[in-house]
Amino acid sequence: MSANDIALKVAADAGRAAQELVLGLMSMPWGQVSPSVYETGRLVTLAPWLTGHGERVRWLIDTQRSDGGWGAPEGYGLVPSLSATEALLSVLRRGDDTGVGAETLREAAARGLRLLSRCLSGAGLSLPDMPAIELIVPSLVMLINEHLEENGMSVPLTLPVGMSAAPLEAVRAWVASEAEIPQKLLHALEIAGDAANGAAVAHVTDIGTIGASPAASAAWLGDRGPSEPGHPVRWHLEAIVRRHGGPVPVGLPITVFERGWVLSWLARAGIPFEVPPEMLADLRAAIGPAGTPAGAGLPPDADTTSVALYALALLGVPRRPDSLWAFETPTHFCTWQGEEGSSVSVNAHVLDAFGQYAAVRPAEAARYAPAIGKLRGWLLERQREDGSWDDRWHASPYYATVSCSLALHEFGGPAAVPAVRAAVEWVLDTQSEDGSWGRWTGTAEETAYALQLLLFAGGEERVRDAAARGYAYLLRVADVAEGPPLWHDKDLYRPLAVVRAAVLAAIHLAQSRSLGVRPISQV
């Protein structure tokens, strides 16, 4: 089947595609996530005894960029490049039999080292706001420098300007003391070094994960891995590596996160589909008094909680959003307790949750009106001069902008109208010649976000023309299984089903809105 045939099939029945997508969530309950260079590199170093070791090494070799680095452009490439380079140096030091020649390994590691040396010695390095980056970078630089010292190389890597090893040392001492640590730190337990091995502060979940992270799980299992094949954590890791034939994602499971986002994208767009009753029951049951985590091993967070609540309200089974009060601060809502920084997309999703519940339960609307007003004001203050928003949980401003704009469009009232209009203008001004949108290059995911904003909040001829061009682009790239990872974790990742739902929503909106979008036969 040609790409055009696929496009026509997808466009002809977004409802059927949405139904298949929702049913697929039941068959893969841990979630569907792209493999991670960072996490895969950590398993190469920490768990060479694990199934798929050779496949992981070869995958790292195959995904190295021509400039010697790994990962996305700009500062996003530092963490994956450090992890992959250190992993290859570990393989060389141990002399692992991976099926990859020693010369190939040496050349790839040397290219990685040259890029890292240039990158870290320069003054223009700007690092993104990624979880635990202030701990991960020093831990990897220290490991690489140990390799260099063993090989008699006298020029160690330096830390980025403004970054110190002191926070890492403090966390390692904290873990070693066996005192209770914040649950969110377990997601990056591998940075604790030897103290992670069997750390008493970590608790194995029912499905055998530590912190919903393969790297954290392998670091905690440590030297028991080879000798205890039946250990729950070993079993969990074996199950994960089979997903991609060796490489692993940065976070798994993401059960509640994935279901909340998929269902909300589809329902908000008005796509007809049925949700398995047990999925709705599971989603409702996951939300406790303190909210819900994205998946087992993670702390509750306002983002997952609010999107799950919003999806439930859209689907006709609303649940009071009172668990979100646990995340309220004097000015806004935090992602989790003790968060450093803030997130506009999280606050936009909290606005969605409160606003939609108030809409379907008008008798209770007064209870949430003050919070809705506070959220509106906070989001309006953080809009950039060009009309967009940016965020700490996604590399693309199109994700942040569609999250904020749609929440304000639906629940922000008259005071939010100018801001939404400015966002529409920014989207119109940043469309590429081929009809796509994207931070670095046009992508189906980012085009879907831009298209949704135009179709929900726009209306004049310029909007209709841009929407038609964006729709045509989506049809040309209908096979959306591939695409760059843009979501923030320790490394960038791509939640496949979530992105697929966003694209389906945009396609359905383009077909169903009376905005002059051309028929498929004319595209």
Q: Which residues fall in each region the model found?
A:
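A short helix->beta-strand "capping" segment at the edge of beta-propeller domains
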Residues: 13-25, 199-202
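Edge strands and adjacent loops of beta-rich recognition modules
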Residues: 187-201
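Buried hydrophobic core positions in alpha-solenoid tandem helical repeats
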Residues: 21-22, 60, 112, 116, ...
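Nucleic acid-processing catalytic cores of prokaryotic defense/repair systems
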Residues: 65-70
